[in-house]
UniProtKB/Swiss-Prot annotation:
It is an enzyme of class 4 (lyase). This is 3-isopropylmalate dehydratase large subunit. Its EC number is 4.2.1.33. It catalyses: (2R,3S)-3-isopropylmalate = (2S)-2-isopropylmalate. The lineage of its organism: Bacteria, Bacillati, Bacillota, Bacilli, Bacillales. Binds 1 [4Fe-4S] cluster per subunit.
């Protein structure tokens, strides 16, 4: 019987254990940041342990990093977390992409950009959006702090193999519709728990035609569909992305092995979902989880249960309204979902020559120093600033209410991030998840508009 892509990568990393029981996996790459690593390092100290593989452990600073003045951290807790990681990196011999360094940025952007993320690897990080790296044909998943310590000490982790769910996506994306709309549509249609217990393999002609940036967007939000893992078969687009990057010096001798990473024709999936995107519309969330979304042209749904009622109350909206009725106050272009160069380029096409609506505070936060530099070479910073956007330093920023970048209470924000939970962007903040193009158009018009009519 054939194997799925996920099965092949998983089986190559099993050190001990039987199928159906917890198995001990070897971990090829451990990415860490300032929030979920301090207690894990302290655990090593208390047990007088060393880091098992410091050469496979890489750190960056992202969650608490200020995006205006990166060297002036006013919050005491944030400053302590950042300085603690800097010290731990020195004490344990970990390579750190430090504040202001050329490669610093959101952890799920730093891995791919530096060439650390590669096909066939097992990758973990103390962050739920680690599935992003699955876009390269890797098994990548988020872990908790106790598991971070376990990987520190042993370079292994006990895991139970999930079932396989194939999501076959075909059709040509209409103008003004993007990878973000695909994953939001899937979650809206099948729910925030449809992927629970599964590894999601995204396949089909639509996926094959996506750039790596688009593929990462889709895998990034696998967790919002309840799945711990998202994975895509590596191909020439993948290999071209990895080639020549700083930590990809093994490329020439590895690429032939990477070409073996695919699901066999006779591989059996536990479940299959099929999607034709040829008539897909731009997506907008109206509620307080990513499942609560609509096509742009559709009204918000009727109230079906207490969760819907609570969401409408929190968001200050009513059934029957449409996205264009939302009174927006903020626009956020950023996060590990949509702060890559192609995202900023797409948004800049809409912004160029226009001005941010007077009722809107618009912020652009490149996901990494690499993206920021490349964007500035293309003059994107000038386009955004001339329009009235704030052009910030890289970091997680307004994706979560953990740093100075927060949406005021009661204000609606068009956001390119991945979560719209209550308080996610700050106490009382009202988040609407959209693509970068939709967010850019909203900034100019002061409300949500059909981006298909304005994209150039």
């Amino acid at each position: 019987m054939g194997q799925t892509l996920f099965d092949k990568v998983w089986n190559r990393h099993v050190l001990y254990g039987k199928l159906g029981e917890p198995q001990l996996l070897y971990i090829d790459l451990h990415l860490i940041h300032e929030v979920t690593s301090p207690q894990a390092f302290e655990g090593l100290r208390l047990q007088n342990r060393k880091l098992r593989r410091p050469d496979l452990t890489f750190a960056t600073l992202d969650h608490n990093v200020p995006t205006i003045d990166i060297f002036n951290i006013k919050d005491e807790i944030a400053n302590k977390q950042i300085t603690t990681l800097q010290k731990n990196a020195i004490d344990f011999g970990v390579h750190i992409f430090d504040m202001g360094s050329d490669e610093q940025g959101i952890v799920h952007m730093v891995g791919p950009e530096t060439g650390l993320t590669q096909p066939g690897k097992t990758i973990v990080c103390g962050d739920s959006h680690t599935a992003t790296h699955g876009a390269f044909g890797a098994i990548a998943f988020g872990i908790g702090t106790s598991e971070v310590e376990h990987v520190f000490a042993t370079q292994t982790l006990w895991q139970t193999k999930p079932k396989n769910l194939k999501i076959d996506i075909n059709g040509t994306l209409p103008t003004g519709v993007y990878a973000k709309d695909i994953i939001l549509h899937l979650i809206k249609t099948y729910g925030v728990d449809f992927g629970t217990g599964y590894a999601l393999e995204f396949t089909g002609e639509t996926i094959k035609n996506l750039s790596m940036d688009g593929r990462m967007t889709i895998c990034n939000m696998a967790i919002e569909g309840g799945a711990k893992y998202g994975i895509i078969q590596p191909d020439d687009i993948t290999f071209e992305y990895v080639k020549g990057r700083p930590f990809a010096d093994n490329f020439a001798k590895s690429v032939d092995k990477w070409r073996e990473l695919y699901s066999d024709d006779d591989a059996i999936f536990d479940r299959v979902i099929e999607l034709d995107v040829s008539t897909l519309e731009p997506q907008v969330t109206w509620g307080t989880n990513p499942e609560m979304g609509v096509n742009f042209s559709e009204p918000f749904p009727e109230i079906n249960d207490i969760n819907d009622q609570r969401a409408y109350d929190y968001m200050g909206l009513e059934p029957g309204q449409k996205a264009e009725d939302i009174d927006l106050g903020y626009v956020f272009l950023g996060s590990c979902t949509n702060a890559r160069l192609s995202d900023l380029i797409e948004a800049s096409h809409i912004v160029k020559g226009n001005k941010v609506h007077p009722n809107i505070t618009a912020i652009v936060v490149p996901g990494s120093r690499t993206v920021k530099k490349e964007a500035e070479k293309l003059g994107l910073d000038t386009i955004f600033k001339n329009a009235g956007f704030e052009w910030r330093e890289p970091g997680c920023s307004m994706c979560l209410g953990m740093n100075p970048d927060q949406v005021p209470e009661g204000v609606h924000c068009a956001s390119t991030s991945n979560r719209n939970f209550e308080g996610r962007q700050g106490k009382g903040a009202r988040t609407h998840l959209v693509s970068p193009a939709m967010a850019a158009a909203a900034a100019i018009h002061g409300k949500f508009v059909d981006v298909r009519k304005v994209v150039v």
